[in-house]
């Protein structure tokens, strides 16, 4: 089922009900974040876009180190963490709301929530590059290991998109 009209959307914080968001995630993602959430919930905040009926999209903003970082994220993310960039992880759009700009609306809502903040994130699917680039993120690093491809993106609040060398 594809929902064509969205009348009302709200950005909501899920402080005490993380499972509501975790349940919409792919099973692999649930296994990654679920077991460690208790240990990192003070460092992360779940934001969801919802209408009156359900969660349409959501993600987690980490103000410090995200959990379960890969070696690529550890090495390349350190300078951004040191500069106070927030990490965006687990951005997911529900199947009924895909191709309706919900991911872009979620990112825009987060940028509006933190107007003076810069962000970083990583992707493991190259097909997502265009999505993040059209939302103002710049690719600043690419893993050299073909068995575990990853790309790091940054969004700077001043829109300069510089690369830390």
What residue ranges belong to the model's regions?
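Conserved N-terminal entry element of GNAT/NAT acetyltransferase domains
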Residues: 1-22, 163-165
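Conserved active-site alpha-helix within GNAT-family acetyltransferase domains
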Residues: 125-149
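Conserved GNAT acetyl-CoA-binding A-motif
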Residues: 112-125
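Conserved acyl-donor/pantetheine-binding loop and adjacent beta-alpha core of acyl/acetyltransferases
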Residues: 28, 35-90, 98, 146-151
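Long, low-complexity, intrinsically disordered N-terminal extensions of eukaryotic proteins, enriched
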Residues: 84-87, 161-165
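Conserved acetyl-CoA-binding loop-helix of GNAT-fold acetyltransferases
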Residues: 90-93, 99-112, 134
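Charged, low-complexity C-terminal accessory regions
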Residues: 147-164
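Conserved GNAT-fold acetyl-CoA-binding loop/helix
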Residues: 13-38
């Amino acid at each position: 089922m594809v929902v064509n009209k969205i009348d009302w959307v709200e950005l909501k914080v899920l402080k005490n009900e993380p499972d509501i968001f975790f349940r919409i995630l792919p099973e692999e993602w649930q296994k990654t974040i679920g077991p460690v959430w208790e240990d990192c919930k003070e460092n992360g905040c779940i934001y969801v876009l919802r209408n009156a009926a359900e969660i349409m999209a959501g993600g987690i903003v980490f103000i410090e180190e995200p959990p379960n970082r890969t070696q690529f994220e550890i090495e390349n993310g350190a300078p951004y963490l040191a500069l106070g960039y927030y990490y965006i992880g687990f951005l997911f759009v529900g199947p009924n709301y895909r191709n309706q700009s919900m991911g872009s609306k979620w990112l825009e809502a987060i940028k509006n929530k933190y107007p003076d903040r810069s962000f970083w994130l990583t992707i493991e699917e190259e097909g997502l590059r265009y999505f993040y680039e059209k939302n103002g993120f710049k690719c600043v690093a690419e893993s050299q290991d073909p068995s575990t491809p990853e790309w790091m993106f940054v969004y700077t609040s001043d829109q300069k998109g510089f690369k830390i060398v």
